[in-house]
Swiss-Prot record:
The keyword Ribosomal protein applies. InterPro entries: Ribosomal_uL5, Ribosomal_uL5_bac-type, Ribosomal_uL5_C, Ribosomal_uL5_dom_sf, Ribosomal_uL5_N. Part of the 50S ribosomal subunit; part of the 5S rRNA/L5/L18/L25 subcomplex. Contacts the 5S rRNA and the P site tRNA. Forms a bridge to the 30S subunit in the 70S ribosome. Coiled coil: none annotated. HAMAP family: Ribosomal_uL5_B. Belongs to the universal ribosomal protein uL5 family. Keywords: Ribonucleoprotein, Ribosomal protein, RNA-binding, rRNA-binding, tRNA-binding. This is Large ribosomal subunit protein uL5. It comes from the Bacteria. One of its GO terms (molecular function) is rRNA binding. The gene is rplE. GO terms for biological process: translation. This is one of the proteins that bind and probably mediate the attachment of the 5S RNA into the large ribosomal subunit, where it forms part of the central protuberance. In the 70S ribosome it contacts protein S13 of the 30S subunit (bridge B1b), connecting the 2 subunits; this bridge is implicated in subunit movement. Contacts the P site tRNA; the 5S rRNA and some of its associated proteins might help stabilize positioning of ribosome-bound tRNAs. One of its GO terms (cellular component) is ribosome.
């Protein structure tokens, strides 16, 4: 059975009943669900070197298994030598099977490879969504350490249908995200 089937099955069989009991939901449709995962790399240094965008696109494509899209600037900023529609970042939006696959690889393989890893911060955005900042792309096994020219970080945003931070936290905790300050549940 694939990682996707494992996480989906785990969500339906274990996570949904646990969250229904914890929050007192009357319908399965009230239970929060993970809608999408957005991976974003802001590459400000790309204004000087255009090859950085190509490298970032290929690395993010290798990490996620889906083609990465360059993001462009919206306006001119002369202090940063930035022109309108100049590529300054890379992003990927994962949904459905690829989302669950990436989540499983992130939790089981990539996060434990971070040096001195003690867990991730437990602050959500107020609407049940969570953004995780990663400083180096080399924690992913798909990246060849010898081939990289520059260490690049990324932001990984987990978008949920949760109405509150408490619901979003509970959902992500059940999916296996290793939060640092694990809140005590009653």
């Amino acid at each position: 059975m694939s990682a996707t089937a494992n996480l989906k099955k785990d969500y339906q069989e274990r996570i949904v009943p646990a969250l229904m009991k914890q929050f007192g939901y009357t319908s399965v449709m009230q239970v929060p669900v993970l809608k999408k995962i957005v991976i974003n790399q802001g590459l400000g240094m790309a204004t000087g070197d255009k090859k950085i965008i190509d490298v970032a696109v290929s690395e993010l494509t290798a990490i996620t298994g889906q083609k990465a899209v360059p993001t462009v600037s919206k306006k001119d900023i002369s202090n940063f030598k930035l022109r309108k529609k100049m590529p300054i970042g890379v992003m990927v939006t994962l949904r459905r099977e690829q989302m669950y696959e990436f989540l499983e690889r992130l939790v089981r393989i990539a996060l434990p490879r971070i040096r001195d890893f003690k867990g991730i911060e437990s602050k959500l955005d107020g609407r049940g969504n969570y953004t995780l900042g990663i400083n180096e792309q080399i924690i992913f096994p798909e990246i060849n350490i010898d081939a990289i020219t520059k260490i690049l970080g990324m932001n990984i945003t987990f978008v949920t249908s949760a109405q509150s931070d408490e619901e979003g936290y509970a959902l992500l905790k059940e999916f296996g995200l290793p939060f640092k300050n694990a809140k005590k549940q009653n």
